[in-house]
């Protein structure tokens, strides 16, 4: 992992609030994974064996309904993390993840992270706080989806891209 990769990972919402020694422990065993446009990172209902931080590119999180239609849940960009809550629980991914551009990701092994959390109360408390912040962001996202028209959501998305 390059110094720039480490900076991006350290500044992610998942790790930014952690004390530096804990951040270093989490990233110690992490790997950089490169994916091409259209490449599947994981599928809905796969065992959640890792969580990810986007270094570069865009990743789409989506669900396939029983009717076979695809519902995009979120689009992740640089510095955003995904898969953390379910990976920490040891469950299955509730969504699929696919690169929509060439992308580079930090892949953090879920079992290793769960072991770290059990042995380090400071890390466990900090990760819990980070997960809570992520939950707040998801609640705000649902509110935006329900309270805005499609045109308003597209305009807001484009404004976010320009920022």
Can you annotate each of these PLM segments?
Residues 100, 118-163:
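Polybasic "coupling" helices that flank or enter modular domains
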């Amino acid at each position: 992992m390059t110094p720039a990769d480490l900076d991006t990972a350290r500044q992610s919402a998942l790790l930014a609030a952690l004390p530096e020694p804990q951040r270093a422990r989490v990233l110690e065993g992490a790997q950089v994974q490169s994916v091409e446009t259209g490449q599947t990172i994981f599928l809905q209902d796969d065992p959640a064996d890792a969580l990810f931080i986007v270094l570069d590119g865009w990743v789409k999180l989506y669900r396939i309904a029983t009717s076979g239609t695809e519902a995009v849940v979120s689009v992740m960009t640089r510095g955003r993390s995904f898969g953390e809550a379910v990976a920490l629980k040891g469950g299955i991914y509730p969504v699929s993840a696919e690169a929509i551009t060439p992308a580079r990701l930090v892949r953090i092994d879920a079992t290793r992270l769960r072991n770290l959390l059990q042995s380090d109360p400071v890390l466990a408390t900090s990760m819990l706080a980070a997960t809570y912040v992520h939950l707040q962001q998801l609640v705000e996202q649902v509110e935006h989806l329900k309270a805005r028209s499609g045109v308003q959501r597209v305009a807001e998305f484009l404004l976010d891209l320009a920022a």
